[in-house]
Amino acid sequence: MSKQFTLGALAFGAVFGLAAPAAAAGIAVIPGYASLGEVSTTAYHQPSRSPFGMETEPATGDVSSKWHAVEAEIEQEEAVLVNCRSEQACPAAALELLDIVAEGADRAGRARIGLINRAVNLAIIPTSDEAQWGVADHWSPPFETLQTHRGDCEDYAIVKYVALLEAGLSRDDLKIVILRNFAPNQDHAVLAVRLDGEWLILGNNTLALVRDKDMIGAKPIFVLDQDGAHRLIASNRVAASDPLLHRTLQEN
């Protein structure tokens, strides 16, 4: 990238587009959030290992170090959840996370993902890191977010990542993606979930499960998963299907 990525720019309520207006599609949008506009349905790619059909390269710096720190805390919290399931002493935040997981326990596939996405979105009040922590950027592990019931976009994504793992989804099918919105010019974190060969994007500003190929108004920059932090780069397939997206990726 030619510009330094600034984590402090992550927006806690950024809006990304859908292939139809929320109201027309019968989608329930969380009260107080901006409505969603129409977008093109141009597909960027065929199903792939990475969201948006893009290639990746290892990322270093602040993004990588913050993700590794959160991963270490997630590992500790997963051990606590194991104890909770064996009826040992369980902190309130862990019980709340298990309650979120239970929202989708009796369902499968898209229904399970949607119910857990809804439960997380309704459990957390969108709050900037400046307002909550007095710093430009702070990434919280799930228990910390659920203790305060406040967080910004990456905090929602991290809770969803762990909740869906606990619900039985594979780590291979879960990736946190950092996007750069075109308007406003802000960075925004979402969770990408692979289902039946397609990637669904779960944001904190809507209850809709949006296919990656139905999104416009933002470009993907980083992907965070079990393999660490990686920067997304435009592939030849993306360049052929969407020259504008390819050009904007190369410019940043």
Describe each region flagged by the PLM.
Residues 9-17:
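Bacterial N-terminal signal peptides
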Residues 2-8, 21-252:
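A structural boundary/capping signal
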